[in-house]
């Protein structure tokens, strides 16, 4: 009975919930789904103890400070969650000779290029959110060699650069907001990403940086080829 043990943090977020649903179809792993109530990933000791006690093999970090517009006012909290915490998770994964899947964002780029970004493009964040997520990627890769960073164009690419402004404007008209989200099919999108993560879990984590976006996965082909 030595099933691989998978820890999914941020389990009550959009991606975490999709991971939970898909876990039903992937019974060959044992799962631990946590949110801040079960495990505060900003507490290094708590992370180390949890991972050791439950003998975790792979950590999938779906937890992040994602309120892009509020990040500028909450720099410290944002940095803790997006930069420091992934380092703790990576350290814990390494202590078990395990792997980390760190979910990141295309906000590590400034959004001025209109072509899809490639993995080898040099990051150039122009927001607190983007800077902290980039620092989190670097910290994770530094602390654990078996780290797979998946950058996703969350909802950001769907709306272009004015996502936040659009949301604030639409916030006044709730019905409109509902329609917009329905049209985009946000959950499907999160589900696609969750499915991609399960492909990695099933086939074995290949360390490095990968881009995943709604156009499909630029380097997923290379990733599966590498296995």
Where is each model-derived feature located?
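N-terminal Rossmann NAD(P)H-binding glycine-rich loop of SDR-like oxidoreductase domains
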Residues: 4-24
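SDR active-site strand-loop-helix element
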Residues: 9, 34, 59-63, 100-105, ...
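Mid/C-terminal beta-alpha module of Rossmann-like enzyme folds, strongest
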Residues: 14, 196, 203-227
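Rossmann-fold cofactor-recognition segment
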Residues: 32-45
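NAD(P)H-binding glycine-rich loop region in Rossmannoid oxidoreductase-like domains
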Residues: 44-81
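Catalytic helix-loop patch of NAD(P)-dependent Rossmann-fold dehydrogenases
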Residues: 80, 84-88, 108-150, 154-155
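NAD(P)-dependent short-chain dehydrogenase/reductase
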Residues: 138-185, 190-192, 198-199, 227
């Amino acid at each position: 009975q030595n099933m691989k043990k998978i820890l999914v943090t941020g389990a009550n977020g959009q991606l975490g919930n999709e991971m939970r649903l898909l876990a039903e179809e992937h019974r060959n792993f044992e799962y631990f789904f946590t949110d801040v109530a079960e495990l505060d990933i900003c507490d290094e000791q708590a992370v180390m103890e949890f991972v050791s006690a439950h003998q975790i093999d792979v950590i999938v970090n779906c937890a992040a400070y994602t309120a892009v517009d509020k990040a500028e006012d909450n720099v410290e909290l944002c940095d803790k969650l997006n930069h420091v915490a992934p380092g703790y998770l990576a350290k814990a994964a390494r202590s078990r000779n395990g792997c980390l899947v760190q979910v990141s964002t295309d906000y590590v780029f400034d959004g001025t290029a209109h072509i899809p970004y490639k993995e080898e493009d040099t990051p150039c964040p122009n927001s607190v959110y983007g800077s902290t997520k980039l620092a989190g990627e670097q910290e994770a890769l530094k602390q654990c060699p078996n780290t797979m960073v998946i950058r996703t164009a969350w909802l950001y690419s769907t709306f272009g650069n004015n996502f936040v402004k659009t949301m604030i404007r639409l916030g006044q008209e709730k019905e409109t907001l509902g329609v917009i989200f329905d049209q985009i099919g946000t959950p499907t999108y999160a589900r696609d990403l969750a499915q991609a993560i399960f492909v990695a879990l099933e086939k074995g984590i290949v360390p490095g940086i990968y881009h995943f976006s709604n156009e499909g996965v630029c380097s997923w082909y290379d990733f599966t080829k590498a296995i």
